[in-house]
Amino acid sequence: MLPIQCKMARTALEMGVKQLADAAAVSTNTIVRFERGEDLKPRTIAAIRTVLEEAGVIFLDGDYSGVGGPGIRLKAME
């Protein structure tokens, strides 16, 4: 997950920094730093990504990115 994908995912979910930080068991400063492009430990990024995926985000990376580059998509609501 790239920092911009984290920001896009939070925005799409209408999730605040504090809400994501609490759910991922990290500080709000950690989320802010990551979204600014600062490096985090891989396990911290994984924890944040897991919360976003469980909330319905699909990350578009690699072969799925196409011309537009990495992005996100929301799972269809049932």
Identify the function of each model-found stretch.
Residues 25, 42-60:
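DNA major-groove recognition helix of helix-turn-helix/homeodomain DNA-binding modules
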Residues 4-19, 76-78:
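Short basic helix-loop element that most often maps to the first helix and adjoining turn
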Residues 57-78:
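Helix-turn-helix/homeodomain-like alpha-helical modules used for DNA recognition
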Residues 25-40:
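Recognition helix of helix-turn-helix/homeodomain-like DNA-binding domains
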Residues 2, 13, 41-44:
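Short, conserved glycine- and acidic-residue-centered signature motifs
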Residues 6, 20-21, 31-34:
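Conserved hydrophobic/aromatic packing and binding residues within compact polymer-binding modules
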Residues 11, 22, 36:
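Alpha-helical residues within the helix-turn-helix
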